[in-house]
Amino acid sequence: MEKMHITNQEHDAFVKSHPNGDLLQLTKWAETKKLTGWYARRIAVGRDGEVQGVAQLLFKKVPKLPYTLCYISRGFVVDYSNKEALNALLDSAKEIAKAEKAYAIKIDPDVEVDKGTDALQNLKALGFKHKGFKEGLSKDYIQPRMTMITPIDKNDDELLNSFERRNRSKVRLALKRGTTVERSDREGLKTFAELMKITGERDGFLTRDISYFENIYDALHEDGDAELFLVKLDPKENIAKVNQELNELHAEIAKWQQKMETSEKQAKKAQNMINDAQNKIAKNEDLKRDLEALEKEHPEGIYLSGALLMFAGSKSYYLYGASSNEFRDFLPNHHMQYTMMKYAREHGATTYDFGGTDNDPDKDSEHYGLWAFKKVWGTYLSEKIGEFDYILNQPLYQLIEQVKPRLTKAKIKISRKLKRK
């Protein structure tokens, strides 16, 4: 096994084709981290000219100290049963990490627990310290240890039927409601950033500046690994739909009124149907007024939600999502999610990753809402083997490990204060 010098394109091709590859190991992802003070180095190992393992090493300076952390996010990208390749990757990583004065090498492989026996054993044998099997969104991890993934390698009907029944009904309703899902461009990031600001204010979290999203889009869109989707509501088109539905409801009432006059047996049923139709008419009249007001203010329509969809080979990722507070009954997020899944499938993806979660948290948990949303999309829990640290400077490592929990508690307090506002 030997060190190899490969191009960025060769690195990315290996990551995208490997079962343990991940978005965070793409070279263009490293470009997005520069804004937050990270810089990258890359390594590759192989035999007879054939690459057998790669890793993208991210480095960040420790504040006020001449040291760095070496972080291999969702790496190494290698077959973890291949001890020789794994050992060669560690040797290469150590060489660079020491040159960059790293106090530790942190990895969190994209390897699931039920397939991770070799990885656990071989990493520990090499001297890695396992950080344990904590909850998926534990503050002790950089990346979530658990994510929710929908298999999307199926036709439209099979995909829809994989969703939980109630969610399936919501998706069907969203498709009828009259929103339009657009694959947008860089200009659309302005709208997305505005929607993200609204979402942050509603849900009580700090949001990123538009430059952050532009950075991701600029780095990854050219290779087809980042797409922006926006959901639009056209008032004129939907007023026409509401008028049509009102006409149908009035016709239905007339039909049941006629049946009441001709059949006493059907009188009770007819009255119930008439009452139901009248309730629907009242709701549609309210909706029509709202849409007419919207048409006066925004005749071109408004955007209700948006999301960034990412790719790494056969894996797709719902990275960021945002939504308006208006017209939520149109279920724009349901329309968008289903559309993005189909788009991802049509562009070679077999899985759709909703991102981090805990495993079936209690209803009073701050993470319950995430779990409840993600579990209805035909997802399974992807439980990773977690984080591992290879310690290069034991005294500094111990000091930082002692300080980190205090910093985490401070961040949690700030987050909770924001949510209470």
UniProtKB/Swiss-Prot annotation:
InterPro entries: Acyl_CoA_acyltransferase, FEMABX, PG_Glycine_Bridge_Synth. GO terms for biological process: cell wall organization; peptidoglycan biosynthetic process; regulation of cell shape; response to antibiotic. Keywords: Acyltransferase, Antibiotic resistance, Cell shape, Cell wall biogenesis/degradation, Cytoplasm, Peptidoglycan synthesis, Transferase. GO terms for cellular component: cytoplasm. Its main location: cytoplasm. Its EC number is 2.3.2.16. Gene3D superfamilies: 1.20.58.90, 3.40.630.30. Monomer. PANTHER family: LIPID II:GLYCINE GLYCYLTRANSFERASE (PTHR36174:SF1). Belongs to the FemABX family. This is Lipid II:glycine glycyltransferase.
